[in-house]
Amino acid sequence: NPAVGNKKILLALDDMKGSAPHFISVTASNNKYNIKETTVPLADHIQNDLAIPTIAHLPAIYLSKEKVADTLRELDAVGVNRILALRGDIIPGVEPLKDFRYATDLIEFIKAEAPNFDIIGACYPEGHPDSPNQISDIQNLKKKVDAGCSSLVTQLFFDNERFYDFQDKCTLAGIDVPIYAGIMPILNRNQALRLLKTCENIHLPRKFRAILDKYEHDPESLRAAGLALSLIHI
């Protein structure tokens, strides 16, 4: 299927198949406006050619209701009916559309337009960057769940204690759906620095910072140490 992208992605997916993952999620970016050309074909390939359950990301801040409805039909036609419903990042200088200002708006629309879809929501153990505080953030998260999310997946984090604290607060708020932890191994220094710059709300514990400094000029050892820490993290 030539539409699914470059050979590196296909080879990586073939390797993953041997691990029998519970699912693979397919990302989408607001910067390209090309969900139909990238996300849908790749999700189709994973779901049908590789027989791995697939979740399609759907950031909607720059999409109209008509575009989202079309995307849902295209995904449904290839048997992909699990969605990670996202507002999506706002692009500096590009005015968002008004149909989906919040992820909750998208979740409510999907429930009405395609009730057979399983909707997953995003959550932020260390707080959404746009939220004034964690209490407000968890209140908004409860709205997502009430709107129709069957489960939640977290933004990546490196401090387990902050995740456990977040879980406890969600329980107190009446959020009773499964919360899946987002784990990303540190594989190289540039990746880690880029993540910290992009996700300014994320706390990097001292042990993670220590390996970045210790193996600054030894990329192979940094990769090995990053993977080992991720296994402990899990």
Language-model regions: role of each:
Residues 232-234:
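Conserved small/polar residues in nucleotide/adenosyl-binding loops
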Residues 182-230:
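Catalytic-face loop-and-helix region of soluble metabolic enzyme cores
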Residues 1, 24-26, 54-58, 83-85, ...:
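Hydrophobic faces of well-ordered beta-strands that scaffold small-molecule active sites
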Residues 36-56, 100-121, 166-180:
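Alpha-helix-loop-beta-strand connector modules within alpha/beta enzyme cores
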Residues 6-15, 19, 32-50:
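Glycine-rich, positively charged N-terminal anion/phosphate-binding segment
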Residues 21-40, 89-98, 153-163:
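Glycine-rich, proline-tolerant flexible connector loops at the mouths of alpha/beta enzymes
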Residues 1-7, 55-66, 122-136, 214-227:
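Active-site mouth loops of central-metabolism enzymes
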Residues 24, 75, 144, 148, ...:
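Conserved, mostly hydrophobic/aromatic
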